[in-house]
Amino acid sequence: WKNSVAKVEASALEAVALIPRELQTRTYRPGGYRAFYVYEPKRRLIQTNSFKDKIVQHAFCDQVLYDALTKPFILDNYGSQVGKGTHFGLNRLRDFMREYYRKNGFSADGWVLKADVRHYFQSIRPDVLKKDVAKYLHDPDCLALACQIIDSTPDPLGIPIGNQSSQIFALLYLNQLDHLCKEQLRFRYYGRYMDDFYI
């Protein structure tokens, strides 16, 4: 990663001028990934892209993806969103537990289901994700770029944990589960942080 930063810094003006031109002419193609493992809190494969691709994704996520894809989210989808996060999610869970306790005659008798999706990022189906993205991203150029990013790994299944866009894509992928639990099944006490959820 540091070598790719040095290469871009060495020709910064050329690189900055090249990115918009490639995006406008639809000649931009995401490069390859460098893979490594992190071990906190558990062993995870991280795939990081080039510095040039990080610039594209950062701008794309901040200017397009975030606003377009987070609009349909429920309040109790806590991950990777402005004004939310782990503390927001924990506060909501605490409030739900207190409300349940009061509504049930100050009895703590009840159950909480806590679950997660095993190997979540690695199990996301690109074909399903692209259909979900297309529901909310209507500009054809932006949709084409999103699909390029989704398809940019050599693996036929999954999205890289190291991409900024993967955080937003992963939140969207389980959005239908959120709406099913909250609206159709009417689970008041439901919340999700990425692939971890409780009922």
Label the model's feature ranges.
Residues W1-L129, D151:
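Conserved two-metal-ion catalytic palm core of "right-hand" nucleic acid polymerases
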